[in-house]
UniProtKB/Swiss-Prot annotation:
Region of interest (Disordered), ranges: 56-80
GO CC terms: cytosolic small ribosomal subunit; ribosome
Subunit organization: Part of the 30S ribosomal subunit. Contacts proteins S9 and S11.
GO molecular function, one term: mRNA binding
Protein name: Small ribosomal subunit protein uS7
GO biological process, one term: translation
Family as reported in the entry's similarity comment: Belongs to the universal ribosomal protein uS7 family.
Record Pfam families: Ribosomal_S7
The UniProt record lists the keyword Ribonucleoprotein: yes
Amino-acid biosynthesis is among the record's keywords: no
Upper classification of the organism: Bacteria, Pseudomonadati, Pseudomonadota, Gammaproteobacteria, Legionellales
Function: One of the primary rRNA binding proteins, it binds directly to 16S rRNA where it nucleates assembly of the head domain of the 30S subunit. Is located at the subunit interface close to the decoding center, probably blocks exit of the E-site tRNA.
């Protein structure tokens, strides 16, 4: 048992553009080496690509890749202008992001429990804060593993894939659920 008392929960300030605490935490998950402004550009750029793709799909069923601009820097600058000014695009992007996060969130996971000399993988239900943390972590991890040219496009396509029920993060969630289902017989060992 830990001898210290539990650390107090710190409140997260909402992000400046969407005023969403969920998105602020996601920006922090994308951030590396304390470079928050870079992480914000990546996330906002990805959400802009997501908004354009969803608008094109619902509107004209066009290609709407956002990749036709040539250099990746051009995409970032153009996308930041669009998402900062267009309220509908902002709402659409946020809803799509929340939908992706909901689909990636796992419900159960397995934890090791030692009973009488043997170790069992015991399925346990996950509390909401950990579900969200795992979903954020998996989205960023599997976006990094993609082959697109820039992180903006990798993250955007991972979010879009998650909404449609495919992609690396969704596969990870299914693997975790499959593992829990396979070890359901040991559920009575939970603590």
């Amino acid at each position: 048992m830990a001898r210290r008392k539990a650390a107090p929960k710190r409140e997260t300030l909402p992000d400046p553009l969407f005023h969403s605490e969920l998105l602020a935490k996601f920006i922090n998950a994308v951030m590396r080496n304390g470079k928050k402004s870079v992480a914000e550009k990546i996330v906002y750029g990805a959400l802009d690509v997501v908004a354009k793709r969803v608008q094109n799909k619902s509107g004209e069923q066009g290609d709407g890749d956002g990749e036709s601009g040539g250099k990746a820097g051009g995409i970032k600058k153009r996308s930041l202008g669009d998402i900062r000014t267009d309220e509908n695009a902002r709402a659409l992007a946020l809803e799509t992001f929340k939908g992706a996060l909901d689909k990636v969130m796992p419900n159960v996971e397995v934890k090791s429990r030692r009973v009488g000399g043997s170790t069992y993988q015991v399925p346990v239900e996950i509390r909401m804060a950990r579900r969200q943390a795992l979903a954020r972590r998996w989205l960023v991890e599997y976006a990094n593993k993609r082959n697109e040219k820039t992180m903006v496009l990798r993250l955007a396509h991972e979010i879009l894939d998650a909404v449609e029920g495919r992609g690396g993060a969704i596969k990870k969630r299914e693997d975790v659920h499959r593992m829990a289902k396979a070890n359901q017989a040991f559920a009575h060992y939970k603590w």
